[in-house]
């Protein structure tokens, strides 16, 4: 288990500490917005700014709002986080004048001179944070990705248990990690599904060539028989005594030339076929683009755009865009390689042609040369035609081979999915404990029960949007359509995994909620916060940070929270703005 404790947050310049905030090593840390007069506001005093600065110090990119602020830049402000990781003290620093760098200091005391710190690029700094906090626990889980769930953003973090505009696979993988459930199931199954999708695209491409295997087999037999007839005629001609010596040499060169010409034709044919495929894909994409105004057409005519038409149009457009990007590039690469081979073959052909002309001059009978040339030319034409037929047969046979591969992959999905489902079932005790924790928090807060469920998606589907192997999480509470209840649902949802990790001594024992206590009922906020503080103190691990305004708490709750030392920062506009987070207005 890796334990990280946020001990202090400093606001400094090159000469002094402007502000210092000390945090409870275990328990609830409340960042309180205050006002001295009724007409004053508690917004804008720096609660969210403090949370953002903690995020910056834990590897988040500093936003332009800070890096372009002249007041911060002129004051040469840098922020420092004093953390303890597995008993070792580390200072982490970021400077608004140097947002693309991070600073680390392994010492027991803080220095204002950044020259004494280890300055690294932001990418190296993020890797340092990653290594210190997670210690490489999961190769495909990063602290940068988890940070959005550990530090919920007040603007977008409390609309749902999942974050907006994020891929479902990644979201549930991260949440499953936080809930200590398997994280690899859907991702590993998707590897097989992606291979199947790629193979299906190849099948569609082959089917677009309109191959009739029966006709091709008949044509192949006909051409083989015709070529054998020509071979007999040529053989008989070549064995004539009068021309035996000279024609042998002539025939050898001619045969070699025919082979080269045959290869050239086959390559040119393949090259043309690839170009036709590229042209067909581009034409179809052009036609699809011509339908871009179809949504406006429907809206103008019937007042709305049918969902079924929209879905079909999106699927067609997505497919052909994929084909142009993926198969188009594939065909172009093949064309370049074939053209390089053609150049070599044409050079060889030129040499053989010159040898053939020289051999022909040796022969005395022009009629003989003309006769054998006609026969051999006809034979060459049939061999080229046969090569083309066999190429198309090969394409058809390839389709059957692809189907075999798809069947193998589908069987593998069935096997792996069954194995992962059994693995998920083995986590039933953890799931039960998580549900119990969730409902206990609901009971403490609302004297009600909610619904928290973890379901393994066991359905096998070939659909592109299939989520086979995903461990889905569902969460609901009574009356959650109100903003206050919705925000409290997400608070309790996060607190469930947070408390579970603290109780079971798992890594990542920090949770930060910014702005999520503004809307809930004042009568339940203090009750929940006091319960969380008691639970963390009982287990002697875990830090829960929240921002809240003074007027959003009941007076009795406020006094008790303060008496128990849970309020770690009081921010307001008084004392000439020195009580703001930075100690000044910016």
UniProtKB/Swiss-Prot annotation:
<feature type="coiled-coil region">
    <location>
        <begin position="331"/>
        <end position="400"/>
    </location>
</feature>
<dbReference type="InterPro" id="IPR018760">
    <property type="entry name" value="DUF2326"/>
</dbReference>
<feature type="coiled-coil region">
    <location>
        <begin position="183"/>
        <end position="293"/>
    </location>
</feature>
<keyword id="KW-0175">Coiled coil</keyword>
<protein>
    <recommendedName>
        <fullName>Uncharacterized protein YydD</fullName>
    </recommendedName>
</protein>
<dbReference type="InterPro" id="IPR027417">
    <property type="entry name" value="P-loop_NTPase"/>
</dbReference>
<dbReference type="Pfam" id="PF10088">
    <property type="entry name" value="DUF2326"/>
</dbReference>
């Amino acid at each position: 288990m890796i334990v990280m404790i946020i001990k202090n947050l400093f606001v400094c310049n090159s000469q002094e500490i402007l502000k210092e905030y000390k945090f409870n090593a275990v328990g609830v840390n409340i960042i309180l917005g205050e006002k001295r007069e009724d007409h004053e506001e508690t917004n804008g005093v720096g609660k969210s700014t403090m949370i953002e600065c903690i995020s910056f110090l834990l590897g988040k990119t500093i936003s332009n709002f800070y890096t372009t602020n002249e007041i911060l830049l002129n004051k040469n402000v840098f922020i420092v986080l004093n953390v303890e990781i597995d008993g070792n003290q580390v200072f982490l620093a970021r400077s608004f004048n140097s947002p693309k760098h991070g600073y680390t200091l392994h010492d027991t005391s803080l220095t204002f001179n950044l020259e004494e710190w280890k300055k690294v690029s932001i990418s190296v700094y993020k890797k340092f944070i990653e290594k210190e906090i997670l210690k490489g626990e999961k190769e495909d889980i990063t602290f940068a990705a988890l940070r959005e769930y550990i530090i919920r953003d007040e603007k977008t973090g409390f609309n749902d248990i999942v974050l907006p505009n994020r891929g479902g696979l990644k979201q549930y993988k991260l949440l499953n990690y936080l809930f200590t459930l398997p994280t690899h199931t859907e991702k590993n199954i998707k590897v097989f599904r992606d291979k199947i999708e790629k193979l299906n695209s190849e099948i569609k491409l082959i089917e677009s060539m309109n191959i009739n295997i029966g006709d091709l087999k008949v044509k192949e037999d006909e051409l083989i028989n015709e070529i054998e007839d020509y071979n007999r005629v040529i053989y008989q001609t070549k064995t004539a005594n009068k021309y035996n010596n000279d024609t042998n040499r002539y025939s050898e060169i001619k045969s070699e030339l025919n082979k080269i010409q045959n290869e050239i034709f086959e390559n040119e044919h393949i090259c043309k076929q690839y170009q036709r495929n590229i042209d067909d894909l581009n034409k179809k994409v052009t036609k699809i683009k011509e339908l871009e105004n179809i949504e406006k057409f429907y809206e103008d005519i019937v007042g709305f755009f049918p969902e079924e038409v929209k879905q079909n149009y999106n699927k067609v457009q997505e497919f052909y865009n994929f084909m142009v990007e993926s198969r188009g590039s594939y065909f172009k690469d093949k064309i370049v390689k074939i053209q390089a081979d053609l150049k070599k073959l044409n050079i060889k052909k030129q040499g053989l042609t010159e040898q053939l002309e020289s051999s022909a001059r040796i022969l005395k009978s022009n009629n003989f040369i003309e006769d054998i040339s006609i026969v051999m030319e006809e034979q060459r034409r049939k061999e080229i035609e046969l090569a083309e037929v066999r190429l198309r047969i090969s394409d058809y046979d390839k389709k059957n081979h692809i189907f075999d591969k798809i069947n193998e992959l589908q069987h593998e999905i069935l096997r792996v999915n069954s194995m992962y489902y059994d693995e998920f079932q083995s986590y039933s005790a953890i799931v039960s404990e998580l549900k119990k924790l969730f409902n206990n928090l609901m009971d403490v807060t609302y004297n009600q029960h909610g619904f928290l469920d973890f379901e393994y998606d066991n359905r096998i589907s070939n659909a592109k949007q299939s989520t086979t192997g995903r461990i889905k999480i569902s969460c609901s509470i009574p009356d959650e359509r109100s903003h206050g209840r919705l925000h409290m649902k997400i608070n309790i949802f996060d607190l469930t995994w947070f408390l579970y990790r603290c109780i079971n001594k798992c890594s990542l024992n920090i949770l930060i909620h910014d702005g999520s206590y503004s809307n809930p009922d004042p009568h339940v906020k203090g009750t929940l916060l006091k319960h969380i503080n008691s639970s963390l103190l009982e287990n002697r691990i875990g830090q829960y940070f929240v921002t809240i305004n003074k007027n959003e708490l009941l007076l009795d709750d406020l006094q008790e929270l303060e008496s128990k030392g849970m309020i770690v920062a009081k921010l307001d506009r008084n004392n000439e703005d020195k009580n703001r987070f930075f100690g000044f207005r910016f």
